[in-house]
Amino acid sequence: MSRARDAGCVAAGIVIGASAWYCVYKYTRGKDQKKKRLTKPKNRASVGTGSRARAGLRAGFTIDLGPGFSPPNPVDIEIMNKAQGEASNLATTVAEEVAPAAPSPKVQNGAESKVQELNGAKTEANLESVVMPSATCTVTPPPKVAGGLTAAEAPEIIGAPKVLEAPSTTEASGAVAAPGPTVSPMIAQTPGPVVPSPTIVSTGPAAIPWAVAHPGAVQSPGPAVPPMAVQSLVPAAPSWAVVAPPGAVYIPVAAHFAGPAAASRVTQSPGTVIPPLPPPSSVLPRGVPSVPGRTVQSPGAAVHPVAAQSTGVVVPPRAVQYSGAAVTSGGAAVPSGGAATPRAAASTQRTASTEVMQVPRVAAATEATETPRIGTPAMVAEASLPVHSGAAENPGTSGSSKTAATGKKAAPGAHTGAIPKAGSATGAVPKGGGGKGGNKNRSGGKGKNRKNKVDVDELGMGFRPGDGAAAAAAASANGGQAFLAEIPESEEGESGWTDTESDSDSEPDVPQRGKGKRTIPMHKRPFPYEIDEILGVRDLRKVLALLQKSDDPFIQQVALLTLSNNANYSCNQETIRKLGGLPIIANMINKTDPHIKEKALMAMNNLSENYENQGRLQVYMNKVMDDIMASNLNSAVQVVGLKFLTNMTITNDYQHLLVNSIANFFRLLSQGGGKIKVEILKILSNFAENPDMLKKLLGTQVPSSFSSLYNSYVESEILINALTLFEIIFDNLRAEVFNYREFNKGSLFYLCTTSGVCVKKIRALANHHDLLVKVKVIKLVNKF
């Protein structure tokens, strides 16, 4: 405990003194330097023989590793590049004067003095690039090689190649072993039993191509703890120059060659410059065994003395990486964006527990040798460049561009962004089904073209063949009213009917699972059945084709009713005409079935509201009049037929076609019911407004019961229409001079004169209870 306390005091004094010296030195020397504009960091690394490797910094990227870690400080890329270039030149110059063996403390001090004399002003850049407040131990290998960073180096070193420039960030190569007892910051481990090195963990944002132990670094105790900070060195130092910050201990990485390590030990003073000689690539054997290096550790992390890990160490599940990549130790790249699986094979004696982080594009040694290890499983993400695990790698495998990546096994659409095919999980609804009831059509089945107990005819309309005969039989037993099965409204968009063809060839028919066949309950009610949906062009064409092809009365009635309801809209009136539906519908009045005739007349009545359609339907006016007279009195055919003729006689263009039917209208007027009377009075009023038809109308012999229409007990609707007819005729009689001799007695002319019977009855209606009738009567009386 006393040794640890003394060592801590000494370390604290060194840190305080070095900090004061550094502040004074920076203040005195910093005035002469000019500020340079920072260049934009490049996010690439170029590697070549004799050229410096440059790597960009992803600035502004921070990762929260917990309350015990602080965010990395920003790194000046320009200063670091300048420092590395100067360190490279300095290493080449000083290497000629330094022996290959590890120098003594005096030699190192002399080298430091020489370097300071040669580059006094340039040392500040090196110190700024080395001293990082939050990075206590950073290790970065040369670029694009999957070599082990802490692999042991050979004692023989020939030549001094150019120094590689360190990237701006540090990469954590593996997991850190479980924490153990801490040691004084300046105490390094003595060479003991050789153990495979665990991984190198760094919390700082920048890395330099040497290992620097910060005064605050905590390491686990080795076999022996010397009182001073001593580190064993191999005969040849690594292939780069080191400018240690004040109070830092130089911990070189072991050589890549096999051989006995030098027993010389060097204690470094603050600011010492180490000019080692790098080994040439020609001397590096491929298959030599590797000597494990020592552990370099960041502050706050303690390593167990016996914790040893191989190159197959896998990043723990909680590892946070800058590039989002977890890479195997053998240089295998893993997919980006994924997390390493906790079940990855790793030959370790202790389980790593400390969180680590990874920085993209970390360079590796150019001639690293590897030992066979188990790679990371294929469930982790792929990285752009290989990462090192801290131990030697497979012989003969280098981290060049030929480095093989482990295959990944991703779920479909998980990482690739591929959209899965349309199915039940995608939410795509096929055209044959709706939202509320699933993909059920009118037949009660699942999806299109499905059948259940309710058979579907060959045209796919969802009606049972042969129901027409049953409907006719039911009609005869029900007083002429046919009972038809209620068909539920469709949920298939515009059509309102089951689609027998796919709207689009590209839409797959997705069957719905887990739903059995269900029979739609058949609720019966009399016609007419109203469908509120407005059909489109395609659906109207389908209904017209169905009406033309089917011989089933049931289907014909429903199709005509559908067309009739849709013909109420002006847009569909034109659409049906353009589709050639007018003759198809009009030909249905030739059917002997009164229900089919009625539905056809209803459709024709709605279609006749369009003037262009009237030109196509005028040829059917006499046929409709014949059907009216041949039908039962007060039947639906008569009422609907008269409504059709009312629309056709609104204009004067086609009234002459019914000039021979005026007497029949008066006969129906005297015999028919209220609806018949109303429609006939409207037709006669249209005739009265046409001067060409007025003379024919006035000369018609009318029944004596015609004057009874102006009695007070008559329904108000009938009475109002009768008063309207009389007003039109009376106005025309006052406007024109008619010869009385041209009209016979009993004609309409004599009934409408001022001395006629109708005028007397109209005067008696002045006290009628209906206000509209009373107003109408007063208006007429003022004209008498």
From Swiss-Prot:
Gene that encodes the chain: Armcx2
Organism field: Mus musculus (Mouse)
Domain of life assignment: Eukaryota
Keywords: Membrane, Mitochondrion, Mitochondrion outer membrane, Repeat, Signal-anchor, Transmembrane, Transmembrane helix
Short name of any one Pfam family annotated for the protein: Arm_2
Localization in the cell: Mitochondrion; Mitochondrion outer membrane
Family the entry assigns: Belongs to the eutherian X-chromosome-specific Armcx family.
Chain's role: May regulate the dynamics and distribution of mitochondria in neural cells.
Mitochondrial intermembrane face of the membrane: 1-6
Region (Mitochondrion outer membrane (MOM)-targeting sequence): 1-6, 26-40
Descriptive protein name: Armadillo repeat-containing X-linked protein 2
Membrane topology: Single-pass membrane protein
Biased composition regions of type Acidic residues, renumbered to the chain: 488-508
Cytoplasmic side: 28-784
Tissue: Widely expressed in the adult nervous tissue, especially in the forebrain, including the cerebral cortex, hippocampus and thalamus.
Any GO CC annotation of this UniProt entry: mitochondrial outer membrane
UniProt keyword Transit peptide, yes or no: no
Keyword hit for Hydrolase: no
